[in-house]
Structures are given as structure tokens and as C-alpha cells.
Design a protein with these regions (language model features):
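Glycine-rich loop-to-alpha-helix module at the N-terminal edge of alpha/beta enzyme cores
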Residues: 101-190, 200
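Short, well-ordered beta-strand elements within core beta-sheets of diverse protein domains
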Residues: 103-109, 124-130, 215, 324-327, ...
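Residue-level signal for inorganic ion chemistry
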Residues: 100, 136, 158, 180, ...
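ALDH superfamily catalytic-core signature
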Residues: 298-442, 466, 471, 505, ...
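Rossmann-like NAD(P) dinucleotide-binding subdomain of oxidoreductase/dehydrogenase enzymes
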Residues: 191-334, 462
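N-terminal mitochondrial targeting presequence
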Residues: 1-59
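Conserved C-terminal structural/oligomerization subdomain of aldehyde/semialdehyde dehydrogenase
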Residues: 4, 45, 101-104, 288, ...
Length: 570
């Protein structure tokens, strides 16, 4: 049996310590969501190489355990459909979060390598833009099929580098794959409009690609976020430079390999690596026309402000503090299960994690039962069968999360379930924080005002629906929210009055499917939410409208004097 730690404190109903089960199912270093950098020079392993045995199917060659890699290889750049060893002098060590064993080194790509990526994308753009939409669509069909064939392999990369359970990592891949599948239908949505505006005259509008675009991706969704960007950008005719997180670039490296196999021409998709210098290069490089970013407010606001000042389009999804209002009339069993899953899945490292519960009226008495359900979750290495959640991304993240839990104690909150100090016996060196529930939280406390980005649920008590709505609206973030109720009128009022971009009614994580768009608001998205990911807004972000008015006279002009008045075409 693995080592166990009790997670209950201070609540009479939970005073007897009950163990959790120990078996379980930069700007990117410097400015990723609630993280700190780890920039030690290191020996490494190129994820793409490690997962791609030369003589075997790529879909069946991948790690299935947290066993230490004996000869780690360096992660390369990806330029012109080739993996290219970096000449970097600075490297980022990447460790398995469950063991802190070295997995690979990720380069701070050199200035020459950064420029080479944009050179490749710029060179590829004219031919890719001229490629017919049907040809691009056929490539995307092949890409989707290859992602499905390599689904397990991609998930294994995520588990090894990011720490998610295999099942959760498969979900990461699937939500990105759904966007790629939706992108196959982009030709239908790219159709323009035409109108005969006068005799022999027509006006037509249509969408054109921007050129070279870039994506700066976070650590928490190594497959999904790149797949929010690459399929939509390329299907609309752009070429792209991707900077995956230096914490877990392996999934994107595999996706790049599959893109080349699917038939994407050289230079259409390129990968560079690094932290702040790479981000600054992307922001300041004039040939890059648009930037997609998901990550922390500190990074995103900087990228949005500086990128916009440089004349670029910027879509930036930022931090969150997602609330769920629990009404007394709700289906209690469904609500408690949904809350536990949404709060603690992926160790709380989701921008749509349900991190805050608003307990309305008598529902505050349900918290001991919620804590019991959280104790039943299995915390272990992601490759272990039955794991429900794994480690957090780094020792620095663990330290920060535990510091916020401690601050809640100091400010007078009640630690109903305490996940600090939990260590599975098989993985004593991992970055472990167990599910934590903090009760009696007040709006001024740090655990409420800051995004924790860990397996921590903070709970506030209110008396009425009005109080719940006012509390949620007073929070500066607006990524998502949820309500659990059986009352249609209550849900309708909540839907109308709450200021959040994505809302779930009896749904804890209301992330829209690709036919819609990811529509956070308030401080959770830069620029007031004008540029959102995927769906029609995603297509609009990666394209510009061209309007053409043409005149083809059916008879020769007979007038010899030019007219200087404003034409009205009437």
C-alpha cells in the first residue's frame, strides 16, 4: 500500500482522519499560469525521437510507465518538415512531474533558428495560399486520421511530460482533435458574398489568409491548445510558427511529425522553443501578422499590449476563477460528483477548472459529503491504472499552491480537506498535492483573489441567489461559471445576469465544442473578448476580408467628360 496522509481538519464531521487512496488513474517557464521558471542547463531526450522507433509503427511505440529514461535526448526544432538539432547555449530541463526524473532538454532556440522558422513560413505562404481549398481539406482529413491513429502515443507524451492521467491526457487530445475535425469544414465557412449593386456592377467580399501567424501555447494542454490553432490557421491558408511550452513540448513535436506525414508542405508548420526571448521575438517580428496565446494574465496582457502596439492581431485567453453556484433544489448527487471531478481533475491545472463553489443557503452543510467524495479520488502516477489525478507540473507550482493553502489558514478559513504532504509510496519524489477543500472563505482572502491552478476548491457561503450573482459578478475574471439547480426560472435568471463568457447549467466545465467558440470575458480574455478561439470567430481571426467592386459594361461608354462627384452606383 502506498503512503497515506489524512486530508481532514477542523470540521467535526470529518475529525477522524480518513486516507486518500494512493493508487490512481514565459513566458512559458517564467510567465505560464501561476508558475515559476526552471532554467537549469540539462541533458535531454527529444520527445519526437523517443516516441518514434524507426522500424515500428509510430502508433505503438511510446512509453507506458514512469521508468527513468536512460539516455535522454534533446528536443529539436522543427523547420521545413524536418527535426533540426538546436545550437542553443541555454537549455530547459524537463522532468517527469511524477518522479522528477529527467525526460529531455528543451532549447532556447537561437536567434538564427527563430529567424529560420519565420523564413520558412514566409517562403511557404504564397504557394500554400494558392493551394486549392479542396487540396488543403484533403491534407486535413489525413491529419485527423493520423492523430486518431496516434492518440495513445500523444496521450503518453502528455502523461510523461505534463503529469495527467492517461485517460485525462486522451481527453486533452480529443478536444483538440475535435477542432481539427471541425476545421475540415472550413471551406464551407469561407464562402464569400456577392451582390449586383447596379447595372453591370457587382460587389463581392471574401476572406483571405493573413500570412505568417504564431501560437504561444501553455503547459496545461499540450495537445489541445496547439490544435486550437494549427488546423484553423492552416485551413484558412496561413502558415504558422508554434512555440509549445518548454515544460512539455513533446505532444506538439508528434503533431508536427504527423502533419508532415499528412502532406503539409515544407514551411507551413514550424516549431521553435524557449521562454521570454522567443516570445519577444514573436511579438516584434514584423512578418508575423497574428499571435494566439493561452496562459497567465501577466504574460497575456504583456503579449496583447506589445503585440497590438506592433500592429498585430492578438487573441489571448488568460487566467480564471470559475464559480459554481449550488442551489438547494439541485440534484445533490449529480452536483457533488460534478464539482469533485471539475475541481480536482488534471490536478486543477485547467483554465476552466471549477475552482470556486458558492454554497447557497443550506447547501453549505453538504461540504463534509463533498470532502468524502474527494477523498475517494486516487492520486498517483498518470500511467498507473485507476488514477484520477496526478502531480502538479513542478516543485515550484507545488510550493505556490501549498503557500496559498497556508494563507487561507492564516486568514481564518477552514481547511476542510488538506492535500498537503501527500506522497504515493511508488513515487516519493513527485510534485504531489492532494485534493484540498477550503471552507468559510471570504472574498478578500488570497485563496479567492488569486488563481491557484491546483487541486484546491475554495467555498464561500451566501444566503440567496441574488448574493450568489453579485459575488460572481464582483470577481474580476469571467472565463466560465456554472449553476446547479432544478429550477428553470432560476437558471434563466442566472444565465441572463451573470457576467461570464461561458456558462454551464448543471454542467461543470462548459467548454464549447468546435462549432461554437471559446468565449471567456472580463479579465479572462484580452481585448474585451473580440478575438476568441476556434468556431467562426477563430476563422475570422486568421483571415481578413477583401471587398471587390467590378464594372463590366454591356455597352461602350459614350461620355467624354469625367465626373468628379462621389459615385453612388445608383
Amino acid at each position: 500500500m502506498a503512503a497515506r496522509r489524512a486530508f481532514s481538519r477542523n470540521i467535526p464531521a470529518l475529525s477522524q482522519r480518513l486516507p486518500l487512496r494512493a493508487s490512481r488513474s514565459s513566458f512559458l517557464a517564467t510567465m505560464a499560469p501561476n508558475s515559476q521558471s526552471n532554467t537549469a542547463v540539462r541533458r535531454l531526450h527529444a520527445t519526437s525521437k523517443h516516441f518514434n522507433a524507426a522500424a515500428t509503427s509510430t502508433a505503438s511505440s511510446y512509453p507506458t510507465s514512469h521508468e527513468q529514461i536512460k539516455t535522454p535526448e534533446d528536443t529539436p526544432n522543427f523547420l521545413n518538415n524536418k527535426f533540426t538539432a538546436s545550437q542553443a547555449s541555454t537549455w530547459f530541463d524537463l522532468y517527469d512531474p511524477a518522479t522528477n526524473n529527467l525526460v529531455t532538454r528543451v532549447p532556447q532556440s537561437t536567434d538564427a533558428e527563430l529567424k529560420a522558422a519565420v523564413d520558412a513560413a514566409e517562403k511557404a505562404f504564397p504557394a500554400w495560399k494558392a493551394t486549392s481549398v479542396m487540396s488543403r481539406q484533403q491534407i486535413m482529413f489525413k491529419y485527423v486520421a493520423l492523430i486518431r491513429e496516434n492518440w495513445d502515443r500523444l496521450a503518453a507524451s502528455i502523461t510523461l511530460e505534463q503529469g495527467k492521467t492517461v485517460a485525462d491526457a486522451k481527453g486533452d487530445v480529443l478536444r483538440g482533435l475535435q477542432v481539427a475535425e471541425g476545421a475540415c469544414g472550413i471551406p464551407e465557412q469561407m464562402k464569400g458574398e456577392v451582390l449586383e449593386v447596379a447595372k453591370d456592377m457587382e460587389t463581392r467580399t471574401y476572406r483571405e489568409p493573413l500570412g505568417v501567424v504564431a501560437a504561444i501555447c501553455p503547459f496545461n494542454f499540450p495537445a489541445m491548445i496547439p490544435l486550437w490553432c494549427v488546423p484553423v490557421a492552416t485551413m484558412t491558408g496561413n502558415t504558422i510558427v508554434v512555440k509549445p511550452s518548454e515544460r512539455d513540448p513533446g505532444a506538439m513535436m508528434i503533431l508536427a511529425e504527423l502533419a508532415a506525414k499528412a502532406g503539409f508542405p515544407e514551411g507551413v508548420i514550424n516549431i521553435i522553443h524557449g521562454a521570454a526571448p522567443t516570445v519577444d521575438f514573436i511579438i516584434d517580428e514584423p512578418r508575423i501578422k497574428a499571435i494566439s496565446f493561452v496562459g497567465s494574465n501577466k504574460a497575456g496582457e504583456y503579449i496583447f499590449t506589445r503585440g497590438s502596439a506592433n500592429g498585430k492581431r492578438v487573441q489571448a485567453n488568460l487566467g480564471a476563477k470559475n464559480h459554481a453556484a449550488i442551489m438547494p433544489d439541485c440534484n445533490k448527487n449529480h452536483a457533488l460528483n460534478a464539482i469533485a471531478g471539475a475541481a480536482f481533475g488534471a490536478a486543477g491545472q485547467r483554465c476552466m477548472a471549477l475552482s470556486t463553489c458558492v454554497m447557497v443557503g443550506e447547501t453549505k452543510d453538504w461540504l463534509p459529503e463533498l470532502a468524502e467524495r474527494a477523498k475517494g479520488l486516487s492520486i498517483n502516477g498518470g500511467f498507473e491504472a485507476g488514477a484520477d489525478l496526478g502531480p502538479v507540473i513542478s516543485p515550484e507550482a507545488k510550493k505556490r499552491i501549498e503557500g496559498l493553502i497556508a494563507s487561507a489558514e492564516e486568514e481564518g478559513a477552514t481547511i476542510l480537506l488538506d492535500g498537503r504532504g501527500y506522497v504515493p509510496e511508488k513515487y516519493p519524489n513527485g510534485n504531489w498535492v492532494g485534493p484540498t477543500i477550503i471552507a468559510n472563505v471570504k472574498p478578500h482572502m488570497r485563496c479567492y483573489t488569486e488563481e491557484i491552478f491546483g487541486p484546491v476548491l475554495v467555498c464561500l457561503n451566501v444566503e440567496t441567489t441574488d448574493d450568489a450573482i453579485n459575488l460572481i459578478n464582483a470577481n474580476e475574471y469571467g472565463n466560465g461559471t456554472a449553476i446547479f439547480t432544478r429550477s428553470g426560472p432560476t437558471a434563466a435568471r442566472f444565465q441572463s445576469e451573470v457576467e461570464a463568457g461561458q456558462m454551464g447549467i448543471n454542467v461543470p466545465i462548459p467548454v464549447p465544442l468546435p462549432m461554437f467558440s471559446f468565449t471567456g470575458n472580463k479579465k479572462s480574455i484580452a481585448g474585451g473578448g473580440a478575438s476568441t478561439f476556434y468556431g467562426k470567430p477563430g476563422i475570422n481571426f486568421y483571415t481578413q476580408i477583401k471587398t471587390v467592386t467590378s464594372l463590366w459594361r454591356s455597352e461602350d461608354a459614350i461620355e467624354t467628360k469625367a465626373k468628379t462627384i462621389m459615385p453612388t452606383h445608383s
